[in-house]
Amino acid sequence: MFVMESVDDLWNHIAYVLAYAPDKFPYRDFLSDEDQMTLELAFKQLREGVMIAYPEDSFASKRDELNEILDRSLEMFRNGNEIAAGHELNNFEGQIFKR
């Protein structure tokens, strides 16, 4: 299972989600079925990355802003609007390190 431990992991995971969301995540034969990547898990891990990038209390509003973008993107993926969802993920990527 993918582990989010650093900002570099976040960058890599954004690209991974952009490439495979919503339902094309590669099957990993060394993982159990419940540990395979899904859309929900991918976005959970993106949120973990937000916390890694902005752990300080002073950045609570930045975390909220970024999580709202992720919420919109996830909802668009769930509703089958993959192009708009991808645009929102690109927006997230562009905003993640703008202070």
Give the ranges of each region predicted by the language model.
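Short terminal alpha-helical segments
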Residues: 1-35, 93-95
